[in-house]
Structure formats: structure tokens, C-alpha cells
From Swiss-Prot:
Taxonomy, superkingdom: Bacteria
Keywords from the UniProt entry: Cobalamin biosynthesis, Glycosyltransferase, Transferase
Coiled-coil spans in chain: none
CDD domains assigned: DMB-PRT_CobT
Positions annotated as active site in the UniProt record: 317
Name of protein: Nicotinate-nucleotide--dimethylbenzimidazole phosphoribosyltransferase
NCBIfam families, alphabetized: cobT_DBIPRT (TIGR03160), PRK00105.1 (NF000996)
Function: Catalyzes the synthesis of alpha-ribazole-5'-phosphate from nicotinate mononucleotide (NAMN) and 5,6-dimethylbenzimidazole (DMB).
Family as reported in the entry's similarity comment: Belongs to the CobT family.
SUPFAM superfamilies hit by this protein: Nicotinate mononucleotide:5,6-dimethylbenzimidazole phosphoribosyltransferase (CobT) (SSF52733)
Cross-referenced InterPro entries: Nict_dMeBzImd_PRibTrfase (IPR003200), Nict_dMeBzImd_PRibTrfase_bact (IPR017846), Nict_dMeBzImd_PRibTrfase_N (IPR023195), Nict_dMeBzImd_PRibTrfase_sf (IPR036087)
A biological process term (GO) from this entry: cobalamin biosynthetic process
Pathway(s) this gene product operates in, as recorded in its UniProt entry: Nucleoside biosynthesis; alpha-ribazole biosynthesis; alpha-ribazole from 5,6-dimethylbenzimidazole: step 1/2
């Protein structure tokens, strides 16, 4: 827990001076004030995150945390548990959606085994396995508290290693059959939200399957009685190893003043967990998209984040972050490369036109 405490103590507020300077700079560029909307807000936010008036977000790295879930035995997913391991092979060989989308958006991808139910020895795979999958949370705690903390610390270590290797932006990705169930349970427990309001169809459940998923989550919460005031207790009782690891990435990135691009529902719950551990983390988050999962709408609202796009995604893997990365990059390039009115020899606005006297 010492490493987690160190991160909490290292996370600061945004640099308001850098934000003000960025806003002033944007207001001198050859465009009407505020006319680039969310792009300008992004540039100002990233200036505040990094503390630089000319921030950089490249190289960008997508970190995909992978783990299995014991609750999958309850039949809460449309796919069998072995798909988790099979997808790791797909990630490593470059055939998954996140690989393709990251190539398009010029981001590197790291795959981390933090809790796969098996032993994988694959070139390029980062082996940080805390335990071989969680227990079935419908019957008892997903893991021990110490294991949840260990998984958070793995995330911190992975984030710091990526940053030390040059990453200027970290994007969150995940894979784990059953992890929408764990994420829904965590959100319901952390925020006292009715389970029915946040559970979606996951990877393609039927209406009957969705009802079963709701019942399993309710049973898990009843059996484990997670403490809403203690996010690590919630993680340990109804969470997942990859969710804990992703929360650690957020903590590590925030401590190093690095922006975090959040993907879909699972990564958003991980980010919410990090914010419940260290509230200042919220300033370092950028929501890449709004997925079709109803719980994702809820989490983005809780975090106060405005998603950059809505493409009806429900994949995970970090896919939304790779799609949104060029938008974030555009915000930075606007600040770096647009000419000012003075540089371009363009006349500014007529001060009194349209204003009440």
C-alpha cells in the first residue's frame, strides 16, 4: 500500500497558470474566439495537466490489461472464458481491433497479463500476473484485499515504465470475459446505483441473459457487502484484476502529470475507482467516447467528463482511445501550428460590433 500512498501524495491540481497562458494563446489565433470548441478546451486541459504551454502527447501508448473473472462461470457472458487467453494471442500477433486502430492512429500498444487464468509465455507480453483469475464473486470475494492492492501497484509500475520510456499520453484498454459484470457490480456498490439501470448487453447477451446478469450482480453484492466508502474493498470483493491495474495506471499517470485517455465502461469504472482513491486524478482524465453500455453514461456523468465521440462502440480493448487520439492530437497541433492574427496579417474582430452599449 506504500506505493499507492506515494502516488496519492504526488498528485497535484492542474497548473492554472499554464491553462491561462494556453487560453490566451488560443485567443490570438486566426479564428473567432472559442470557435474550435472542445478542441480548445482539450488544449487548455492538457496544458494544465502537463504544466506546459506547448504540451506534447506523443508518443502515445495504449496499455491493455488482461485478466479472467471467476464470475464468468455464472454464464454472464456470450463468450466462454477461454476467449481471454485466445485474445491475448491475437493482440500479440497484431490481429485485434486495437492493433489495427492503433496503427491507424500511430500509437504503440502494450499487452499486460495481470490475471489471466493460465500461464502465458509470449514474446512481447508483459507478465505481471497477480493471480490466475478472480474467484466467483457470486459466491464470495473476487480476491483478497492484498491482491487488489498488488494489482493496483502493478498498474502504477507499468505506467511509470511506459512514461520513463517516453510516453506522453497513456490510453486505457482491457480484455477479460466477465468484466462488464464486475464493472457493473463495482459501480452499483461504489455509487449505490440500482443494478438494473447500469447493466447492458455486454458482448451480446440476450434479454434473458441480461436479466441473469442483473441477478448475479445483486447476489454478489448481497454476499460480499462491499463498503462503498472503501474503493479497495469494493475492488477486492466484486472487482477484477485488470480493473485494479487500470486504476493503478491512472494513479501513476496523474502523479507524473501525464494525460489519461479513457476507453469504455470497464476503463471508466477503473478511472472512477482511482478518483475515489485519489480525487485529484479526475483532472487527468479525457473521455474518448460514449459507449452503448448504460453504465458508461452514468460513469462519465459522475466523472464530469464530456466524451469526444459517440460511435455506438461496445468492444473495449482501448478501441475508443485509438479512434479519439487524432482528435486530441488535433487540439495540440492547433495550439502549436496555427498562425496568430499578427503573424498572418489578418485583421481581428471589430470590438464594438454586436455588443450592447
Amino acid at each position: 500500500m506504500q506505493k499507492v500512498k506515494e502516488m496519492i501524495g504526488s498528485i497535484n491540481e492542474l497548473d492554472t497558470k499554464a491553462q491561462q497562458q494556453m487560453e490566451q494563446h488560443l485567443n490570438t489565433l486566426t479564428k473567432p474566439l472559442g470557435s474550435l470548441g472542445l478542441l480548445e478546451s482539450l488544449a487548455i486541459k492538457i496544458a494544465g495537466i502537463t504544466g506546459h504551454t506547448q504540451p506534447e502527447i506523443d508518443p502515445a501508448t495504449v496499455i491493455v490489461m488482461v485478466a479472467d473473472h471467476g464470475v464468468a462461470a455464472e454464464g454472464v457472458s456470450a463468450y466462454p472464458s477461454e476467449v481471454t487467453q485466445q485474445m491475448v494471442h491475437n493482440f500479440i500477433t497484431g490481429g485485434a481491433a486495437i492493433n489495427v486502430l492503433s496503427r491507424v492512429s500511430n500509437a504503440s500498444v502494450q499487452i499486460v497479463d495481470i490475471g489471466v487464468n493460465g500461464t502465458l509465455q509470449l514474446p512481447g507480453l508483459i507478465n505481471k500476473n497477480v493471480r490466475h483469475g478472480t474467484n466467483n464473486m457470486a459466491q464470495g470475494p473476487s480476491m483478497e484485499r492484498e491482491e487488489a492492492i498488488a494489482a493496483i501497484e502493478v498498474g502504477i509500475e507499468v505506467a511509470q515504465a511506459a512514461i520513463q520510456n517516453g510516453a506522453k499520453l497513456l490510453a486505457l484498454g482491457e480484455m477479460g470475459i466477465g468484466n462488464t459484470t464486475a464493472s457493473s457490480a463495482m459501480l452499483a456498490a461504489l455509487e449505490q446505483v440500482p443494478v438494473e439501470q447500469i447493466v447492458g448487453f455486454g458482448t451480446g447477451l440476450s434479454h434473458e441473459g441480461k436479466e441473469k446478469k442483473v441477478a448475479v450482480i445483486k447476489r454478489a453484492i448481497e454476499v460480499n457487502q462491499p463498503n462503498a466508502a472503501d474503493p479497495i474493498d469494493v475492488l477486492a470483493k466484486v472487482g477484477g484484476l485488470e480493473i485494479a491495474g487500470l486504476a493503478g495506471i491512472v494513479l501513476g499517470a496523474a502523479a507524473w502529470r501525464i494525460p489519461v485517455l479513457v476507453d469504455g465502461f470497464i476503463t471508466a469504472v477503473a478511472a472512477l475507482t482511482a478518483v475515489r482513491i485519489a480525487p485529484l486524478c479526475v483532472h487527468y482524465l479525457i473521455a474518448s467516447h460514449q459507449s452503448v453500455e448504460p453504465g458508461h453514461v452514468c460513469v462519465n456523468k459522475l466523472l464530469g467528463l464530456t466524451p469526444l465521440v459517440n460511435l455506438n462502440l461496445r468492444l473495449g480493448e482501448g478501441s475508443g482511445t485509438a479512434i479519439a487520439l487524432p482528435i486530441v492530437r488535433s487540439a495540440i497541433r492547433i495550439a502549436h501550428e496555427m498562425a496568430t492574427f499578427e503573424q498572418a496579417g489578418v485583421s481581428g474582430a471589430i470590438e464594438d460590433v454586436g455588443k450592447e452599449k
